[in-house]
Amino acid sequence: MFFIKDLSLNITLHPSFFGPRMKQYLKTKLLEEVEGSCTGKFGYILCVLDYDNIDIQRGRILPTDGSAEFNVKYRAVVFKPFKGEVVDGTVVSCSQHGFEVQVGPMKVFVTKHLMPQDLTFNAGSNPPSYQSSEDVITIKSRIRVKIEGCISQVSSIHAIGSIKEDYLGAI
C-alpha cells in the first residue's frame, strides 16, 4: 500500500561544501540517499514530495573534523506491503518449488502449495512454466497475487504470496 509519510534524515556535510549553494547540495544529497531506498520500518521510499519545502534545520559542527550535521525533514511517498493485500506483478523466475513475482521494488514468492491444484510445473517447456487447462504462468507473465506474509529486512522486503483464491493468478 502507498502512504505519504513525514520523515527526517541526518546528513553530514564536509566543510568544502559550505557556501551559498549549501542548501541546494543538501537537498540533492537527500534525494540521492533516500529515493529508491528501503527501511524495514517504513518500507520502500519511492520519491520525495514538495522539493521546495524540504525543511533543513540548523547545522551542528562536529568537533572531530569540522563537518556539519544537518537534520533534514521531508515528506515522501512510501510503499509498504501488508498481509492480505492483493497486488499485480510480473513473474521473474519459475522453478519446481514455485515462482517469484516482481511487484514494484519487492519480490513475492508463490510456493506450489499456495497455487490451485490443477496448476502443474512443466520443466520441459522453454522457459519453464506452470500450466493448467486454462492458464499458463511463465516468465514475464502478468499475475495477481495475494500477500500471505511479509519479511522485512534492513534493505529489502520479501513476501510470500498465494494465487489459490478466486480472481487471483494470470491476468
From Swiss-Prot:
GO CC field: cytoplasm; nucleus; P-body; RNA polymerase II, core complex; RPB4-RPB7 complex
What Gene Ontology terms describe what this protein does at the molecular function level? Answer: single-stranded DNA binding; single-stranded RNA binding; translation initiation factor binding
Q: Which GO terms describe its biological process?
A: DNA-templated transcription initiation; nuclear-transcribed mRNA catabolic process; nuclear-transcribed mRNA catabolic process, deadenylation-dependent decay; positive regulation of nuclear-transcribed mRNA poly(A) tail shortening; positive regulation of translational initiation; RNA-templated transcription; transcription by RNA polymerase II; transcription elongation by RNA polymerase II
Q: Which superkingdom does the taxonomy of this entry point to? A: Eukaryota
- Indicate where this protein resides in the cell: Nucleus; Cytoplasm; Cytoplasm, P-body
UniProt cross-references to Pfam families, sorted A to Z: S1 (PF00575), SHS2_Rpb7-N (PF03876)
Q: Which UniProt keywords apply?
A: Cytoplasm, DNA-directed RNA polymerase, Nucleus, Transcription
Q: What InterPro entries does the record tag this protein with? A: NA-bd_OB-fold, RNA_pol_Rpb7-like_N_sf, Rpb7-like, Rpb7-like_N, S1_domain
Q: Which family does it belong to?
A: Belongs to the eukaryotic RPB7/RPC8 RNA polymerase subunit family.
Subunit annotation: Component of the RNA polymerase II (Pol II) complex consisting of 12 subunits. RPB4 and RPB7 form a subcomplex that protrudes from the 10-subunit Pol II core complex. The RPB4-RPB7 subcomplex probably associates with TFG1. Interacts with NRD1 and PAT1.
What the protein does?
A: DNA-dependent RNA polymerase catalyzes the transcription of DNA into RNA using the four ribonucleoside triphosphates as substrates. Component of RNA polymerase II which synthesizes mRNA precursors and many functional non-coding RNAs. Pol II is the central component of the basal RNA polymerase II transcription machinery. It is composed of mobile elements that move relative to each other. RPB7 is part of a subcomplex with RPB4 that binds to a pocket formed by RPB1, RPB2 and RPB6 at the base of the clamp element.
Something else the entry says is: Present with 6420 molecules/cell in log phase SD medium.
Read off the PANTHER family from this record: DNA-DIRECTED RNA POLYMERASE II SUBUNIT RPB7, DNA-DIRECTED RNA POLYMERASE II, III
Q: Write down what this protein is called.
A: DNA-directed RNA polymerase II subunit RPB7
**Species this chain originates from:** Saccharomyces cerevisiae (strain ATCC 204508 / S288c) (Baker's yeast)
Provide the gene name from the record: RPB7
